[in-house]
Amino acid sequence: MIKLSNITKVFHQGTRTIQALNNVSLHVPAGQIYGVIGASGAGKSTLIRCVNLLERPTEGSVLVDGQELTTLSESELTKARRQIGMIFQHFNLLSSRTVFGNVALPLELDNTPKDEIKRRVTELLSMVGLGDKHDSYPSNLSGGQKQRVAIARALASNPKVLLCDEATSALDPATTRSILELLKDINRRLGLTILLITHEMDVVKRICDCVAVISNGELIEQDTVSEVFSHPKTPLAQKFIQSTLHLDIPEDYQERLQAEPFTDCVPMLRLEFTGQSVDAPLLSETARRFNVNNNIISAQMDYAGGVKFGIMLTEMHGTQQDTQAAIAWLQEHHVKVEVLGYV
């Protein structure tokens, strides 16, 4: 549905040349929810704006539903953009128009008959859970409700693609979850292809089928969400995954934790499990194989793309030789082990 090939985007600021995107290629199949994740300044907003040519690529090809957009005339591009809805971080609603009027605007600009506008807007507001807000103004809505209006407006022209530019970044966690569930429901109900950009791996984890990691204007990793969470290939992907799970060291352990080993101490470990290593009885196996005892301090597990992953804080009791052998064995079985210190 979306195929970006060798996209490069260069900005000129006076005598400075800034390369925002460098030879980026991305394929989003029809009906998928595809996430692009990256830190601020990585190029993700520029990338998503190249899809509908809000930013025209310096080089490269943009295919949407089989149509090459970069070669279209302005009138042809305007028509093609009706198939590409877009929502933004800051909603961009017209304060002087009601909820109904905001959603109706693209239909009015397209000279849609009034009775058809009324039918379509009513249908869309019901779909996004705002069936009772026709006559409300944006100033009377919560942030989540404003984004729902923006989603309804983006869907007014029956697009085949929805672009989401940090659509949940301005929302609180509970509202973010409700908006993501709405997008997932719309994707299932309408078969809509969704491309979203975000700096939060939680967003990717909740609704995306595939994910690409962008850094310094380049896609450094892309695969299914389950594969990236199970076998991240880059340090940046690993960092984003770690951000979705966090365990604080209990206060009593922090007081006793030493950086270097001392007499009668035991190592405190942070274990990261992904894919098959989550369900395998690896800690029990280390106890049998290496004569060590594992005391689990705390643990957290989650799912992404149908794959379970998690982290655990443990004490490993045993001789230095046995604990080192057990740690090496865990690492061989795809468990990431970090020695946090000694207690």
Curated annotation (Swiss-Prot):
Membrane topology: Peripheral membrane protein
GO MF term set: ABC-type D-methionine transporter activity; ATP binding; ATP hydrolysis activity
Binding site for ATP: G38, A39, S40, G41, A42, G43, K44, S45
InterPro entries: AAA+_ATPase (IPR003593), ABC_MetN_proteobac (IPR012692), ABC_transporter-like_ATP-bd (IPR003439), ABC_transporter-like_CS (IPR017871), ACT-like_dom_sf (IPR045865), MetN_ABC (IPR041701), MetN_ABC_transporter-like (IPR050086), NIL_domain (IPR018449)
Cellular localisation: Cell inner membrane
GO cellular component: Gram-negative-bacterium-type cell wall; plasma membrane
CDD domains (alphabetical): ABC_MetN_methionine_transporter (cd03258)
Catalytic activity entry: L-methionine(out) + ATP + H2O = L-methionine(in) + ADP + phosphate + H(+); D-methionine(out) + ATP + H2O = D-methionine(in) + ADP + phosphate + H(+)
Its EC number(s): 7.4.2.11
Annotated SUPFAM superfamilies: ACT-like (SSF55021), P-loop containing nucleoside triphosphate hydrolases (SSF52540)
Keywords from the named record: Amino-acid transport, ATP-binding, Cell inner membrane, Cell membrane, Membrane, Nucleotide-binding, Translocase, Transport
Highest taxon of source: Bacteria
ABC transporter domain location: 2-241
Key word Nucleotide-binding present: yes
Keyword Nucleotide-binding among record annotations: yes
PROSITE patterns: ABC_TRANSPORTER_1, ABC_TRANSPORTER_2, METN
Entry-linked SMART domains: AAA, NIL
Family (UniProt): Belongs to the ABC transporter superfamily. Methionine importer (TC 3.A.1.24) family.
Complex and partners: The complex is composed of two ATP-binding proteins (MetN), two transmembrane proteins (MetI) and a solute-binding protein (MetQ).
Role of this protein: Part of the ABC transporter complex MetNIQ involved in methionine import. Responsible for energy coupling to the transport system.
Name of the protein described by the UniProt record: Methionine import ATP-binding protein MetN
Organism expressing this protein natively: Shigella dysenteriae serotype 1 (strain Sd197)
UniProt gene name: metN
